[in-house]
Amino acid sequence: METPAVSLLVAVYNTETYIRTCLESLRNQTMDNIEIIIVNDGSADASPDIAEEYAKMDNRFKVIHQENQGLGAVRNKGIEAARGEFIAFIDSDDWIEPDYCEQMLRTAGDETDLVICNYAAEFEDTGKTMDSDIAQTYQDQPKEHYIKALFEGKVRGFSWNKLYRRSMIEAHRLSFPLRGELEHVEDQFFSFRAHFFARSVSYVKTPLYHYRIHLSSIVQRYQKKLFESGLALYETNAAFLQENNKLEEYRKELDTFIVLHSSICMLNEWKTSGSRRLFEKLRNVGVICADPVFQESLSKTGTAPFDAKRSCLLLMAKYRMIPFVAMASAVYQRVIEYKMRNRG
């Protein structure tokens, strides 16, 4: 049996409205030597039936069903099943250009372990599209520049819009954290390590990946234990860098990461979804402000790396002015929600 050039790994969970668009974009790739592995994470809608429908009409599709275990377990299952020289992760509510595999593979050549393409953010609520400029910004920079930008929040740690050489993943035993370990930050955990171990990184300027954004969900959905997850990611990344004798090289960016993440978590408490009472929100904000890792990192970074609004918020957090931090966070979050609703 011929080894596929690319394994496209599709994570599926209750996306019956969008999955056909996704799977059609995979089926219509300009190159045939690919495999498409769909991992259904216990969906309760028609997504599994649609996936099986495609497997019957095209033998490049393979469907794996499992009980709901979370995104990390889904992607790990796909990695285990993959046979391709390269691996790409696709979310089932997104889609890719017909020449995605062809362009990414051509760019990879024989030496590149990681290829990153620009993506088009498709705003579901407004119908607007916004293209990223990752390739233009980082293609002439050493990979360390990208890693530092990842820690500083200048780029997102998405695992999609990338092509990974499977031998690199296997050689370094790369995998995603499981549910309960690093919730909400699985992609950044994996993306950082892939960049760290890649012999070289290449970029494609064309936006080959279409990322569907549901503003009402992303902007307003409360993420439980978000602060704890970020703190755990900070600590595990610091330990990883220490083991590889690189901690001092990235210390400043790591501190920036946890300070930025903490401020995001302050805003998270004031998202409109969820049933938290005012006392609970104030308590959670207080826990963030009092955290010793946050306070120590803030004392090192100061407020210089951040814009004026975030700097003001962090200055109040530094002195644990909890009522003012809460009020500023609530206003800041409402402004973000308003701007996102009226974007474009």
From Swiss-Prot:
<comment type="similarity">
    <text>Belongs to the glycosyltransferase 2 family.</text>
</comment>
<dbReference type="InterPro" id="IPR001173">
    <property type="entry name" value="Glyco_trans_2-like"/>
</dbReference>
<dbReference type="Pfam" id="PF00535">
    <property type="entry name" value="Glycos_transf_2"/>
</dbReference>
<keyword id="KW-0270">Exopolysaccharide synthesis</keyword>
<protein>
    <recommendedName>
        <fullName>Putative glycosyltransferase EpsH</fullName>
        <ecNumber>2.4.-.-</ecNumber>
    </recommendedName>
</protein>
<dbReference type="InterPro" id="IPR029044">
    <property type="entry name" value="Nucleotide-diphossugar_trans"/>
</dbReference>
<comment type="function">
    <text>May be involved in the production of the exopolysaccharide (EPS) component of the extracellular matrix during biofilm formation. EPS is responsible for the adhesion of chains of cells into bundles. Required for biofilm maintenance.</text>
</comment>
<keyword id="KW-0808">Transferase</keyword>
<dbReference type="GO" id="GO:0000271">
    <property type="term" value="P:polysaccharide biosynthetic process"/>
</dbReference>
<dbReference type="GO" id="GO:0016757">
    <property type="term" value="F:glycosyltransferase activity"/>
</dbReference>
<keyword id="KW-0328">Glycosyltransferase</keyword>
